[in-house]
Amino acid sequence: MRHRVAHRKFSRTSAHRISMLLNLSISLIKHERITTTLPKAKELRPYVEKLITIGKVYREKNLVYGKRLLISKLKNIDATDKLIDVLSVRYKSRNGGYTRIMKNGFRKGDCAPIAIIELVDRQIVSQS
C-alpha cells in the first residue's frame, strides 16, 4: 500500500532532490518550456504551481514579504522577478493549472519516458 508516501525519491538524497527540483523550476520559469523525464515533470508540477500562486497572492497585496519568500525558495532573483512581474500578471484570472505536461516518447539511451512541461498561455515566438 502507498499510504503516507508524499513524493518520489529518485534514488537521491533529500538535499540532491530539493536541488534538482529547484534547478528544474528555475529553468521552467525562465524558459517557460523544458524537456525532462516524465516522473520529474510530474514531481515538478505542484512545486512550480505553488510558487506561481505565492507570486500571485503577494503581487495583489503588493507586499515585500512575498518577494522575499520567493527569493528564499528559488534562490534566483531573475526567476523571482519574472515570476512576480510577468507570470503573476498572466495568470491573474486563472485559479491553478498553470502547467501542462505532454508525453514526448522515450529517450534513446535508456528508454526513459520523456515529457515536455510548459506553462500554459505562453507567447509562442516564431523562429523566422
From Swiss-Prot:
Keywords assigned by UniProt, alphabetized: Ribonucleoprotein, Ribosomal protein
Pfam families with a match to the protein in the record: Ribosomal_L17 (PF01196)
One GO cellular component term: cytosolic large ribosomal subunit
GO molecular function, one term: structural constituent of ribosome
SUPFAM superfamilies linked to this entry: Prokaryotic ribosomal protein L17
InterPro entries, sorted: Ribosomal_bL17, Ribosomal_bL17_CS, Ribosomal_bL17_sf
Domain of life: Bacteria
GO BP term, example: translation
Complex formation: Part of the 50S ribosomal subunit. Contacts protein L32.
Record family assignment: Belongs to the bacterial ribosomal protein bL17 family.
Protein name, per record: Large ribosomal subunit protein bL17
Gene that specifies this protein: rplQ
